[in-house]
Amino acid sequence: MKHFLLILGSLCAASGAIAQTPNPFMSELKQFYTVRKADLLKAADRMPAEDYNFKPTPDVRTFGQLIAHIADAQMSFCSGAKGKPIRLNAAAKTTKADLLASLKASFDECDGVFDATTDVIATQMIKTGNSEHSKFWALLYATLHDNEEYGYLAVYLRLKELIPPSTNSR
């Protein structure tokens, strides 16, 4: 009987701790997003302005084009999740300063959406092109896309003999 009461007490205590964590899905997704956000901003800043036109082979994007792509995609996903799609048009920019400003603007948009999205709100459906997805899907996809693109940026940095931020912080 003592074992049963001990187990029951432990379960009750654990369920209370879980209940105290509001929005566990969005909280965990935001943690992942926040880590990658820091890495992307540091990577964009770390690459010298004169190397924003660098591309390892002729058939891939330049470093600057990757930054623009990240900013444009992020703005699309996050503003779409908010229900008010915004076109950033970072692809039209070429200088490091302008591209960094676009990247920061896309993160500002995403920060607001992540802050306002609870687990319940995340289940709401939104139109994405010809499909419908949950707001959670849009924010998850934005975060996964950031992760993928960061991997490319890390290679570009290494090819320029620069240490990627995620490695540097270890």
Model regions and ranges:
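Short, contiguous alpha-helical
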Residues: 30-31, 38-41, 51-89, 127-170
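Generic structural signal for well-ordered secondary structure
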Residues: 22, 33, 59, 70-71, ...
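Surface-exposed helix-capping loop/turn segments at secondary-structure junctions
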Residues: 46-52, 114-122, 158-164
